[in-house]
């Protein structure tokens, strides 16, 4: 009986799974091979993101294997980020790519070679802006990014203002308006420590400033 069961299992299984479907453990542990572009980017030990424009950004798992990527694949999409991709990233909006701290682009050249290009205009991990534009809806918010000057401006949906708790700032003003901050040219804000669940920053400024962080806050993630 055992022999019959074994024969039945093997004969049926081989109809659906061939020997070619089995992979050596070393290939499973390292499913992707780093390109020369990947190796060049990995020499930079700072904290940044990479945009691989040689493939579908939101269906690509290989780039995330080597770098912090602005893309990647997951069956459960983050709605807001997917909208940001559809409305802005897919259109190569450079200001949005700068805002996402995209320091390197992986692109192809005329010869079909894959190359790494450094983006000199990336905003970094965090920065101060001197203007906050308040809009009335999520639609206005995503469309405002069409013309946003991300190094000096930020956009906030009016419904999100109450999340800013500090008094005497935009949190205490219940009208839809824009807010200006007197930029301190000597002010700094920098990322000191990067852990999976905790990011530590340090800032120094003589005046009240509005900081923008190049991160997605996902409470349960």
Model-flagged regions — what are they?
Residues 29-32, 87, 139-142:
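Juxtamembrane helix-loop transition sites at the ends of transmembrane segments
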Residues 19, 75-76, 84:
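Generic signal for short, ordered secondary-structure residues
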Residues 2-72, 90, 117:
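Extracytoplasmic
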Residues 41, 72-77, 91-221:
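Flexible, solvent-exposed extracytoplasmic
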Residues 27, 79-94:
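Aromatic/His-enriched, Gly/Pro-containing loop or helix-boundary segments
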């Amino acid at each position: 009986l055992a022999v019959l069961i074994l024969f039945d299992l093997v004969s049926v299984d081989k109809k659906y799974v061939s020997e070619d479907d089995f992979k050596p453990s070393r290939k499973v542990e390292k499913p992707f091979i780093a390109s020369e572009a990947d190796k060049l980017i990995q020499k930079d030990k700072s904290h940044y993101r990479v945009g691989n424009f040689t493939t579908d950004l939101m269906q690509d798992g290989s780039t995330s294997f080597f770098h912090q990527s602005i893309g990647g694949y997951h069956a459960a999409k983050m709605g807001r980020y997917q909208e940001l991709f559809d409305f802005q990233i897919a259109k190569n909006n450079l200001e949005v790519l700068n805002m996402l701290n995209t320091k390197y682009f992986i692109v192809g050249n005329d010869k079909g070679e894959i190359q790494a290009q450094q983006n000199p205009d990336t905003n970094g991990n965090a920065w101060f802006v001197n203007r906050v534009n308040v809009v009335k809806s999520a639609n206005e918010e995503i469309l405002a990014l069409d013309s946003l000057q991300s190094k000096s401006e930020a956009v906030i949906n009016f419904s999100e203002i109450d999340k800013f708790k500090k008094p005497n700032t935009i949190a205490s003003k219940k009208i839809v308006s824009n807010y200006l901050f007197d930029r301190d040219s000597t002010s700094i804000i920098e990322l000191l420590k990067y852990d999976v669940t905790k990011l530590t920053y340090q800032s120094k400024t003589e005046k009240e400033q509005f900081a923008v962080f190049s991160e997605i806050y996902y409470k349960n993630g």
